[in-house]
């Protein structure tokens, strides 16, 4: 229970930090930046799935000092590379990798993709709406102390991510409509 309260306080602080910014993109970036620093991770990211193709795109990323951004290399990523993640997401499960070597034999494509980014461990949860997975949100190289708790934390954040992305999409649509 103590951890849940800590997570809720962290989320509230992240929301407050994000509300200091004027645009949805700035708010999302501030939100994940705050969480990344608070968690002590190397990288936090959001991937949004294409509704028309079997691809996913890294749309937001925060990196700790000294960590190389990967967002530019993770556009139009075939979902086949991480199909097993989606199989887990469909069952309501998160991805927890304590040691990248654990997946080397069973998931060689995923291993190659992830180890090439200097990822040793990660926790990833899906987000969605209307009972459909729309993407995922992950943390690379989090502290090893509480992986299970981190999945609870990410599950709590998922609804907020969906809300922030919906606000962003409405903002984009209203700007597009204003041009006509």
Language-model regions: role of each:
Residues 120-128:
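A short, aliphatic-rich beta-strand micro-motif
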Residues 98-121, 141:
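Signal-transducing coupling segments at domain and membrane junctions
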Residues 1-26, 37, 170-180:
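Signal-transmission linkers at sensory-effector interfaces
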Residues 45-90, 134:
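GAF sensory/regulatory domain recognition
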Residues 127-137:
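Short hydrophobic/glycine-rich mini-motifs in sensory/regulatory modules
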Residues 145-166, 176:
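Amphipathic alpha-helical "output/dimerization" segments
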Residues 135-145:
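Short beta-strand-to-loop transition segments that serve as allosteric relay/switch motifs
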Residues 20-59, 67-69, 121:
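Helix-loop-beta substructure at the N-terminus of cytosolic sensory domains
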